[in-house]
Swiss-Prot record:
Annotated HAMAP family: LpxK (MF_00409)
Gene behind this protein: lpxK
Pathway terms, separated by semicolons: Glycolipid biosynthesis; lipid IV(A) biosynthesis; lipid IV(A) from (3R)-3-hydroxytetradecanoyl-[acyl-carrier-protein] and UDP-N-acetyl-alpha-D-glucosamine: step 6/6
Pfam families: LpxK
Name by which UniProt lists this protein: Tetraacyldisaccharide 4'-kinase
GO molecular function: ATP binding; tetraacyldisaccharide 4'-kinase activity
Organism: Colwellia psychrerythraea (strain 34H / ATCC BAA-681) (Vibrio psychroerythus)
Record has Kinase as a keyword: yes
Catalytic reaction(s) noted: a lipid A disaccharide + ATP = a lipid IVA + ADP + H(+)
Cellular-component GO terms for this entry: plasma membrane
Family listed: Belongs to the LpxK family.
Function: Transfers the gamma-phosphate of ATP to the 4'-position of a tetraacyldisaccharide 1-phosphate intermediate (termed DS-1-P) to form tetraacyldisaccharide 1,4'-bis-phosphate (lipid IVA).
Amino acid sequence: MRLIEKVWFNDHPAKWLLVPMLLPLSALFWLISTLRRLSYKIGLSRSCQLSKPVIVVGNIGVGGNGKTPIVLYLVELTRLLGLTPGVISRGYGGKAPHYPYLLDEKSTSIEAGDEPILIQQRCQVPIAVGSDRIASAKLLIAQGCDIIISDDGLQHYRLARDLELVVVDGKRLFGNGLLLPAGPLREGLWRLPKSDLVIYNGKNDQDYQEKNYPCMHMTLAATELCNLLTGERIYLTDFIRLNDSVNAIAGIGAPQRFFDTLKEHQFKVINQQSFVDHHAFVLADFNEFDDNIPLLMTEKDAVKCHDFCKENWWYLPVDATFSDADRQLIIDRTQIAVQSVIQ
């Protein structure tokens, strides 16, 4: 974990030096973002309302909060509702030949970024990436999509949205509660009641219940591992029975969550190593690991390692799960969003 993240989330002693130094920049960040929101509120800037409904999945802070599993969940849910979803993303970490860039079966994370490739490989859904989310969405609508799911983009106010889901890390929550760069927040806690649903990833009874806004709890369920080289799938219980120990790597926004998940499933992790989010893996990154011990990684990291993977490398797919009542609430809100555009 980087020092600044320790200051944000772990009450590191360096906070007494760094936070006062960074507070003036946070004040400037607040001023700029406030003026930007105000320009939309009073009509100086205008949001673009698309011809099809838009669902935005985002967060008010930085780092991995669990947005991608929810995007995957919404893709499957909207399909069950008879819709043809398309996903738009910034494509962070990728460099496409042009924008908006429509992914195909040959697209790589080098061009499109990590998450879009993961989503495409898992769901075979149309995906367009680019900083201009409106252009990306229009490209997908032209391809026949009748509902747009935006992976991130909560602060992209130029894109009007019909349903807004905010994801919160149920364990780390909001860190020290300060705006960037003194804290991890892009927007203050005032933003939560203005969204349609707040989803807490990982239960925190004290902080997510009895709020003055609609909120729910989700968990990330893992039942099997997938081999990077062969595609073989094996249940976690069977894998653990066959393997006493594993190594693990994670290059995501919150790598400790992945390591904790492995330990919760009773894996004995011998060596674990974290990398910065969106790290571009090369084979040399794995030199210190014993090839005789299985190496486990996230699905997001796996999309960048297929070209040089070894036979003992596995990734852990996870799925967002909700209670029946919360699932029905998501369905109801989605149907309302769709009907509001049709009318």
